[in-house]
Curated annotation (Swiss-Prot):
One of its GO terms (biological process) is negative regulation of transcription by RNA polymerase II. GO terms for molecular function: transcription coregulator activity. Keywords: Activator, Nucleus, Transcription, Transcription regulation. It comes from Saccharomyces cerevisiae (strain ATCC 204508 / S288c) (Baker's yeast). Component of the Mediator complex, which is composed of at least 21 subunits that form three structurally distinct submodules. The Mediator head module contains MED6, MED8, MED11, SRB4/MED17, SRB5/MED18, ROX3/MED19, SRB2/MED20 and SRB6/MED22, the middle module contains MED1, MED4, NUT1/MED5, MED7, CSE2/MED9, NUT2/MED10, SRB7/MED21 and SOH1/MED31, and the tail module contains MED2, PGD1/MED3, RGR1/MED14, GAL11/MED15 and SIN4/MED16. The head and the middle modules interact directly with RNA polymerase II, whereas the elongated tail module interacts with gene-specific regulatory proteins. This is Mediator of RNA polymerase II transcription subunit 10. Pfam families: Med10 (PF09748). It comes from the Eukaryota. It is found in: Nucleus. Belongs to the Mediator complex subunit 10 family.
Amino acid sequence: MNGNSTNNEQLQQELATTQDQVASIIESFVELGVSIYDFPGTPEATKGMITNLQRNVDRLYKLNVRSNDPQSSLSKVDIPLEVVQYIEDGRNPDIYTREFVEAIRRSNQYQRGKMHGLKQLRDSLADKIVDEFPELKEPVEDIIKRTSPIDNVSNTH
């Protein structure tokens, strides 16, 4: 477990570093946009603009190298294509997560309802069979025992 803890700490550190790099790149592009808007056209301003552009290209290059490093813990992180599509569409990936969790919850509730309904049907049918055919009580109880969950999942809420 200690190896997993170390790997998790390394992954968290790499994620934090990558997040800082992305934030820095975004901030640089915002600054670049402001600089372009207010660009006076002087040779000094042109030189500063080129320096700023080169800094942005270098930051993007470092981020690209980091993200494609096979030794990095980040190479083992899979991001669902749907999340990437959400981001490309300008949507918040947290919305994807919330909608996904809600869909799973609805599906679980539906499945739980089906299981509960089938259990009631099984028990009702078993009662009717035993009432009409008392000699089948033992096989019916065996069937109920074999078709009942080991841990009482249906009673958990």
